[in-house]
């Protein structure tokens, strides 16, 4: 079983949204999953469940660097680190990078620039971060009301909106994670 850890020490960066979208992607293709919501704020649509036949485990973590997080990092095959693209997010992001380097140097790392837009601040952040990401891959999730609306209906943005930049970016992220776990891509319907 492959373990996917969605983590950042900063709250409000989209960890629960991304954990849900990953779980939805695996569910749409019939891939058995376990899901762990470790965040006491309860921001996920999915509830904690353990499937003995699971091929993957998706783990949503709280927004804090806790001692337990290092144990989760050590067990992770893929680490997804969401961040917003503001100057306030730089220091927590750098702390996460250092923690991953120290505790999970062999894990595949995927950075998600959440709330991406075409304005200068997002572009400046991306240009700066390209030099900081090391071997990690970078995916951009756009600012989109579709994420909010889909969540309100308890759905994936892929099922709710079907088309658009939010859907395309979510598919790209999910397929990159799937590939990193050795699971075939989800095809667009």
Task: Specify the residue positions occupied by each region the protein language model found.
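Beta-strand-loop-alpha "switch" segments that mediate conformational coupling across diverse proteins
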Residues: 117, 127-158
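Structural beta-sheet core signal
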Residues: 34-35, 81, 111-113
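Inter-lobe coupling/hinge region of RecA-like P-loop helicase motors
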Residues: 148-174
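Short beta-strand-centered segment that lines the nucleotide-binding/catalytic pocket of NTP-utilizing
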Residues: 29-44
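Inter-motif core of Ras-like GTPase G domains
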Residues: 66-87
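Switch II (G3) loop of P-loop NTPases
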Residues: 36-40, 52-69
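Walker A (P-loop) phosphate-binding motif
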Residues: 1-31
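Conserved C-terminal guanine-recognition region of P-loop GTPase G domains, centered on the G4
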Residues: 91-118
């Amino acid at each position: 079983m492959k373990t996917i850890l969605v983590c950042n020490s900063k709250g409000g960066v989209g960890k629960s949204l991304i954990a849900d979208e990953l779980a939805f992607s695996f569910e749409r293709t019939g891939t058995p999953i376990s899901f762990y919501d470790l965040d006491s704020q309860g921001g996920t649509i999915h509830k904690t469940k353990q499937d003995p036949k699971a091929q993957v485990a998706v783990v949503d973590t709280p927004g804090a660097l806790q001692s337990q997080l290092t144990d989760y990092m050590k067990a992770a095959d893929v680490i997804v680190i969401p961040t917003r693209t503001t100057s306030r997010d730089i220091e927590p992001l750098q702390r996460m990078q250092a923690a991953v380097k120290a505790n999970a140097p062999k894990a595949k790392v995927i950075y998600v620039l959440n709330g991406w837009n075409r304005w200068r601040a997002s572009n400046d952040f991306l240009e700066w971060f390209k030099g900081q990401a090391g071997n990690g891959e970078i995916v951009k999730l756009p600012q989109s009301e579709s994420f909010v609306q889909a969540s309100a209906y308890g759905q994936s943005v892929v099922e709710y909106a079907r088309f658009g930049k939010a859907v395309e970016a979510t598919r790209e992220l999910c397929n990159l994670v799937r590939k990193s776990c050795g699971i075939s891509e989800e095809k667009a319907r």
